[in-house]
Amino acid sequence: MEKRLQEAQLYKEKGNQCYREGKYRDAVSGYHRALLQLRGLDPSLPSPIPNLGPQGPALTPEQENLLHTTQTDCYNNLAACLLQMEPVNYERVKEYSQKVLERQPDNAKALYRAGVAFFHLQDYDQARHYLMAAVNRKPKDANVRRYLQRTQLELSSYHRKEKQLYLGMFG
């Protein structure tokens, strides 16, 4: 168990190094490998097949904390990588960001990335929700403010079109 936690840390570090070098595909591979090392170790997740195979010793609180921190960091970093790759898979960015937010609801980077994903998936209400939360945590972040402004413009455009539609229907 300790070995798998250490291996996951090494893969995560390789992913971080690749990210710094702009090798996003390799970074994604490193983060995925780290998560694979951790699969099945998380006691808070139900096992797909209970009581199958040998039951390992329970994690210590420190190991469980390291497990959750590593998982959260990997998901957050995966979302960051995917935003740098073409074409961007916004569904995955959304999914990974939400996994981070399950454990760290105040994570400003994950809130921002979720907002960006929802914006590009044209779910502007959800985008606004996440971007407002991000701007509350990082009020000076220009990227967050820019996406929030773009989201507000899309929402007001949508509401104008909706109003015109209803006026046309009901005169």
From Swiss-Prot:
Q: What Pfam families does this protein's entry cite?
A: TPR_19
Entry superkingdom: Eukaryota
Phosphoprotein is among the record's keywords: no
- Family in the record: Belongs to the TTC9 family.
Q: Which UniProt keywords apply?
A: Repeat, TPR repeat
In Swiss-Prot or TrEMBL terms, this protein is called Tetratricopeptide repeat protein 9C
This protein's gene is called TTC9C
Start and stop residues of the TPR repeats: 8-41, 72-107, 108-141
Supply the Gene3D superfamilies for this chain. Answer: Tetratricopeptide repeat domain
